[in-house]
Amino acid sequence: MLRKYYRQYGNDGYVLLMDYSKYYDNIRHDKLMDIFRSLPIDETSLWLIKQSLKRDEIDVSYMTDEQYAHCMDEVFDSLKYQSVDKSLLTGEKMMRKHLNIGDQLSQIAGILYPYQVDSFVKIVLGCKYYLRYSDDSLIIHHDKDFLEKALEQIRAKAKEEGLTLNPKKTRIVKLSSLWRFMQLQYSLASTGRVIQKINPKQLTRMRRKLKKLSHKLPADELTRLYNSWFRAHYKTMSRNQRANMDNLIKELTTKEK
């Protein structure tokens, strides 16, 4: 997509990066069921989906009547919910939004759920260079003013679907700068070259993971795990980063346990 944009506008332009706050926590069951009903799915499968969603409902009996009346419009955070006094969870008030990350239904829902926003961006706003994966999306455009106006309209459309754009992760930056999307850092050079760099935080996480696993896995198994990860990421790493990671795995697999 970046190369296609470059052929038309060069590297002069901007990218609007968007992220939904607590995405899976705020997927509404009623709207999700409307999406599934619009698809060619048999009644038995729809019933099973409905039962699965019922298990994901959140007990919010601790809320006041006024809070409960507006809970579907407020951002829900399952991490903060863990600190709620369990004695207050009586089952009297259930909130029908939130999905458990990891199961098959949540993976499918994560792809499907914002399709109304997708259609709005592509058809109503006419954005040609638009991309979304789960809760991360971007729009590339040569006009910054257009993106600023589009952002406000997208924010309102997302709100209709029960979603809220994360103010810390939603921003407009120049295409020629270094910006992050889906754990990679990108930049569009004046030559048309698409620069991709691994997120340094991802390297830090992998180093910690390897050190932790080095006490649990045999050297050959740890090496296989590392090699698999390295093959998937080495093209986005600098020479120094590759060398540092290689040195780490050698150190971890040769030391005495």
Regions found by a protein language model. Name each.
Residues 66-69, 160, 168-169, 245:
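Juxtamembrane/interface motifs at transmembrane-helix termini
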Residues 81, 85-96, 100, 119, ...:
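Right-hand nucleic-acid polymerase module
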Residues 1, 138-141, 172-176:
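Beta-rich nucleic-acid/ligand-interaction surfaces
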Residues 5-134, 139-149, 238:
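Conserved polymerase palm-domain catalytic core
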Residues 155-163:
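A common structural junction motif
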Residues 128-130, 164-167:
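Short secondary-structure junctions
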